[in-house]
From Swiss-Prot:
This is Endonuclease MutS2. PANTHER family: OS10G0509000 PROTEIN, OS10G0509000 PROTEIN-RELATED. Homodimer. Binds to stalled ribosomes, contacting rRNA. Belongs to the DNA mismatch repair MutS family. MutS2 subfamily. GO terms for biological process: mismatch repair; negative regulation of DNA recombination; rescue of stalled ribosome. It comes from Streptococcus agalactiae serotype V (strain ATCC BAA-611 / 2603 V/R). Disulfide bonds: none annotated. Residues 704-779 form the Smr domain. GO terms for molecular function: ATP binding; ATP hydrolysis activity; ATP-dependent DNA damage sensor activity; endonuclease activity; mismatched DNA binding; ribosomal large subunit binding; rRNA binding. The gene is mutS2.
Length: 779
C-alpha cells in the first residue's frame, strides 16, 4: 500500500481516535505501526479478534488491562547479561502479575466461544515462583525489608542508630537551646547536625559541616553523634550494596525466561489493542464489515470518522460496476463522500471497525490511489492543472485491476470542454482496465457519459431547494443538477429573467426533469428504508435490554453466593477462635495433660455451628460450575479439613498436589481442597492461624521457619505451631530459626524448656542446619 494515500486521507488522525483507549505502551507501539493489509486472511483474523472481545464484554462489562510500561529494552539488557534497576524490575513484575490475572480470567470465562483470542490466552504462561520472589518489590519501586535476611538486619540496625542519634540531638536541643539559632535538627551532607549561633560555635564540640549564607549560623555535628553517624553512613553503604546484590539475583532469576516474558508482554499489549478497537467500535456505533471475495463494496450508513456530526450515506459498488461519477455543483459534499469511501476502505483493511451499519462489506485492494485537492508545486512552477495531471499520469502508470482510484474534480483547471473530454477519456481507460474508480466533477458532459456507458453509474449530492443549502446526502444512480434557476428565483431574481434563461437552455430541460423525478423517487425509497431501520433499531434495543437484565441477574446471583459462603465461614471461624481462647486459658490455669486438651478441643470443635448448604439448589449448581475447571499451579485454595487458605505450587506424578499453606508445605488430593474464586481475592480475608496437616509416621516432619521474623511475631507463631502439632498428634517437628544475632534461637530454647509438652529438643545435625535449626520431640 502506497504511503501517500495515508497522508492524503489523514489516516494517522483516524489512528489517534484509538489512542485514548489504550492502556499499555506495547499496544501504543502496535497502533503506531498499524497499516492497511492486503491479505484477506489477516484482515479476517483481526475482525475475529474484535468479535471475540465483544463476547468478553457481554459477559464482563468492566474487562480491562492494567497500565503497563514497555519492557522490551529491559529484556534486551537481560540478554546482554546486564542487571536491571528497581523500576525495570517493577515493570516486569507488573507484566508477570497481569499475565497471571489474564490466565485466571480466561479460565473463569463462561458462555464464550472464541475464534482467535483463545490462542493468545492459552499462550500466556505464569511464573508462581518468580511472582513470589518479586513480592519483595512493592508498587512504589522500593525493596521491602524481607527481600533478604541481611537487608532486614542492616535496616533494623540503621533504624536503631538513627533513633539513637535523634534522641541524643533531641536532648541537646533542650539542654543547649540558648546556643541554637533554631530549635530543630538539620541535615548536611547526609549527617544530622545542629544549627548553632556563630557566636557560640566553641561552646559545642563537634565537626562543622556548613555555615549559613549570612554567616550567623554554623551547622555542627556534635562529637557525641559522630561515631553513630559514621556507623549510619557505613550501614547505608551496606544497604546499597545488599540492594544491588538482590537486584542482581532478581535479574539472574529472570534471564532464563526472557523469551517467554517477552511473549507474555506482547500478548497483553495485543489484547489491550483489540480491547481498544472494540471500545472504539462501541462508542462510535461502528461495525465489523464483511470481506467480499471479489471487488464488491457495500457501505450502509457510512460516516466520515473525522467529522464531528457526519451525515450517514449508503454506497454500493457492485462487482460489475467499474466507475461512479459524482456530478453537480461544488460545496455539496462530493469530496467528503470521496474521502469517506477511501477512509472506510483503509480502516477495514487495517483491521479496524468501519463507521457504518451491520451488513457493510469491503473489498481488499493491493493499492488505493487518490488525486484530491490542490497539490500544485510552487517550487516546480506547475499550474493547478499541470500538478493534477502529473499526479494522474503517475496513478495511471501504477494502478491495476486490484486497485481503487479516487479522483476529485477530474479534468478541472483547464478549458471546460477540453477538461471534460480528458476526464471521459481517463475514465474510459480505467473502465477498460477494470479498475474501480470514483470521481467527482462539475462538468455536465460526464452525466451523459455515465448514462450511456456500461458499468459506469452517475451519482450526486442532494440539495434542499427550500433552504438553499446542501444536505450532504449521497444519491447513487441520480446525476447532479445545478438548481441554478430555483436558487435564483428564491433569491429574488425577476421571474421574466429566469423564464428567459430557461428558454435559452431548453435543450437541457427534459434531462433536468428526468433527474428531478429520479431525485423524488430516491428520496421516497430512502424514507421507506429509514422507517425499516427504525424498526430494526427498536428490536435491537429490546434484545440488548433482555441481555442486560440476564447479565445483571447472573451478577447478583454470584454476589449472593459469595456472601453466603463468607458468612458461613465467618461463623465457623468465630466459634473455633473462641474455643482456642477457652482452651488456652484452661491450659494456663489447670495444668491439663496434652491428650485432655486435644479431647476438649475436639469436643468444642463439634459445637461449631454447621451451616447445611447441601440442599441449596443454587449453591449445588454453583459448585458444579466451579468443579468444571481443573486446578492449576498458582491457584488459591481452601484446605477443606482446616478451612485455611493456601496456594498450589506443583503437581506430583500420582495426581496429588503440593500446596503452601501459611508456613507449612502440604501434600493434598484434589478432594481435600476447593478452589477460591478470583473475585474473592479482593475481599477482606478473615484472620487465619498457621496449621499443621496431620501426617503419618512415615511422612515428612512438619517444619516452622522463623527466619526474618520479629521476636514477638516469632514467639507467637511458635506457640501456635506447637499447639497445632499437638492437636494433630505429631511426634516430631523442626524449628528453623537461623543463627543471626541469636535472639530468635535463644527465645526458641527458652520457650521449649518451659513447655511441659516438649519431651526433648536438640540442634539439628550439621548437614541439616546445625545450630540454625532445632528438632523437637513432643509427648
Amino acid at each position: 500500500m502506497n504511503n501517500k494515500i495515508l497522508e492524503q486521507l489523514e489516516f494517522n488522525k483516524v489512528k489517534e481516535l484509538i489512542l485514548p483507549y489504550l492502556k499499555t505502551e506495547q499496544s501504543q507501539e502496535e497502533l503506531s505501526e498499524l497499516e492497511p493489509m492486503t491479505e484477506a486472511p489477516k484482515i479476517e483474523k483481526s475482525f475475529n479478534e474484535i468479535s471475540d472481545m465483544e463476547q468478553i464484554f457481554v459477559e464482563h462489562h468492566s474487562f480491562g488491562i492494567v497500565s503497563l510500561s514497555s519492557i522490551s529494552e529491559s529484556l534486551k539488557r537481560l540478554e546482554l547479561s546486564a542487571d536491571l534497576n528497581i523500576q525495570e524490575l517493577l515493570a516486569i513484575k507488573k507484566v508477570l502479575q497481569s499475565s497471571s490475572d489474564m490466565i485466571h480470567f480466561y479460565s473463569d470465562l463462561d458462555n464464550v466461544s472464541f475464534q482467535s483470542l483463545d490462542r493468545l490466552f492459552e499462550n500466556l504462561e505464569q511464573f508462581p515462583n518468580l511472582q513470589g520472589s518479586f513480592q519483595a518489590i512493592n508498587d512504589g519501586g522500593f525493596l521491602e525489608h524481607f527481600a533478604s535476611p541481611e537487608l532486614e538486619r542492616i535496616r533494623r540496625q540503621l533504624t536503631n542508630s538513627e533513633r539513637r542519634v535523634r534522641q541524643i540531638l533531641q536532648d541537646m536541643l533542650k539542654e543547649k537551646a540558648e546556643l541554637l539559632s533554631e530549635n530543630l535538627i538539620a541535615s548536611r551532607s547526609g549527617r544530622s547536625v545542629l544549627p548553632v549561633k556563630n557566636t557560640y560555635r566553641n561552646r559545642i564540640s563537634g565537626v562543622v559541616h556548613d555555615i549559613s549564607s549570612s554567616g550567623s549560623t554554623v551547622y555542627i555535628e556534635p562529637r557525641a553523634v559522630v561515631t553513630l553517624n559514621e556507623e549510619i553512613t557505613q550501614l547505608r553503604a551496606d544497604e546499597r550494596h545488599e540492594e544491588s546484590r538482590i537486584l542482581h539475583a532478581f535479574s539472574d532469576l529472570l534471564r532464563p525466561h526472557v523469551a517467554t516474558i517477552r511473549n507474555n508482554a506482547w500478548i497483553l499489549g495485543h489484547l489491550d489493542f483489540v480491547r481498544a478497537k472494540y471500545l472504539f467500535m462501541s462508542d462510535n456505533k461502528a461495525t465489523i464489515p464483511e470481506i467480499s471475495n471479489d471487488s464488491t463494496l457495500a457501505l450502509i450508513n457510512v460516516r466520515h470518522p473525522l467529522l464531528s456530526n457526519p451525515v450517514a450515506n449508503d454506497l454500493h459498488f457492485d462487482q460489475d460496476l467499474t466507475a461512479i461519477v459524482i456530478t453537480g455543483p461544488n460545496t455539496g459534499g462530493k469530496t467528503i463522500m470521496l474521502k469517506t469511501l477511501g477512509l472506510a476502505q483503509l480502516m477495514g483493511q487495517s483491521g479496524l471497525p468501519v463507521l457504518a451499519d451491520k451488513g457493510s462489506k469491503i473489498a481488499v485492494f493491493n493499492n488505493i490511489f487518490a488525486d484530491i485537492g490542490d497539490e500544485q508545486s510552487i517550487e516546480q512552477s506547475l499550474s493547478t492543472f499541470s500538478s493534477h495531471m502529473t499526479h494522474i499520469v503517475s496513478i495511471l502508470n501504477e494502478a491495476d485491476h486490484n486497485s481503487l482510484v479516487l479522483f476529485d474534480e477530474l479534468g478541472a483547471g483547464t478549458d471546460p470542454q477540453e477538461g471534460a473530454s480528458l476526464a471521459m477519456a481517463i475514465l474510459e481507460h480505467l473502465r477498460l482496465s477494470n479498475i474501480k474508480t470514483m470521481a467527482t466533477t462539475h462538468y455536465p458532459e460526464l452525466k451523459a457519459y455515465g448514462i450511456e456507458t456500461n458499468f459506469v453509474e452517475n451519482a450526486s449530492m442532494e440539495f434542499d431547494a427550500e433552504t438553499l443549502s446542501p444536505t450532504y446526502r449521497f444519491m447513487q444512480g441520480v446525476p447532479g443538477r445545478s438548481n441554478a434557476f430555483e436558487i435564483a428565483s428564491r433569491l429574488g431574481l425577476a421571474p421574466f429573467i429566469v423564464k428567459q434563461a430557461k428558454q435559452m437552455t431548453d435543450s437541457d430541460s427534459d434531462v433536468n426533469r428526468i433527474i428531478e423525478q429520479l431525485e423524488a423517487q430516491t428520496l421516497e425509497t430512502r424514507r421507506r428504508l429509514d422507517h425499516i431501520k427504525e424498526v430494526e433499531q427498536e428490536n435491537l434495543k429490546f434484545n440488548r435490554a433482555v441481555k442486560k437484565l440476564y447479565n445483571e441477574f447472573s451478577h447478583e446471583r454470584d454476589k449472593e453466593l459469595e456472601k453466603i459462603y463468607q458468612e458461613a465461614q465467618e461463623i465457623v471461624d468465630m466459634a473455633l477462635n473462641e474455643s482456642d481462647t477457652i482452651l488456652k486459658k484452661l491450659n494456663d490455669k489447670s495444668q491439663l495433660k496434652p491428650h485432655e486438651i486435644i479431647d476438649a478441643k475436639a469436643q468444642i470443635k463439634k459445637l461449631a455451628p454447621q451451616v447445611d448448604l447441601s440442599k441449596n439448589k443454587v449453591l449445588n449448581k454453583a459448585k458444579k460450575i466451579k468443579a468444571a475447571r481443573a486446578p492449576r499451579i498458582g491457584d488459591d485454595i481452601i484446605v477443606t479439613s482446616y478451612g485455611q487458605r493456601g496456594t498450589l505450587t506443583s503437581q506430583l506424578k500420582d495426581g496429588r498436589w503440593e500446596a503452601q499453606v501459611g508456613i507449612i508445605k502440604m501434600t493434598l488430593t484434589q478432594d481435600e481442597f476447593t478452589l477460591v474464586r478470583v473475585q474473592e481475592e479482593q475481599k477482606v480475608k478473615s484472620k487465619q492461624i498457621n496449621v499443621v496437616k496431620k501426617a503419618d509416621s512415615s511422612g515428612p516432619r512438619a517444619r516452622l521457619d522463623l527466619r526474618g521474623k520479629r521476636y514477638e511475631e516469632a514467639m507467637q507463631e511458635l506457640d501456635n505451631f506447637i499447639d497445632q502439632a499437638l492437636l494433630n498428634n505429631m511426634g516430631q517437628v523442626d524449628i528453623i530459626h537461623g543463627i543471626g544475632t541469636g535472639v530468635i534461637r535463644e527465645g526458641v530454647t527458652k520457650y521449649l524448656r518451659r513447655n511441659k509438652h516438649v519431651k526433648h529438643f536438640a540442634y539439628a545435625p550439621q548437614n541439616a542446619g546445625g545450630s540454625g535449626a532445632t528438632i523437637v520431640t513432643l509427648g
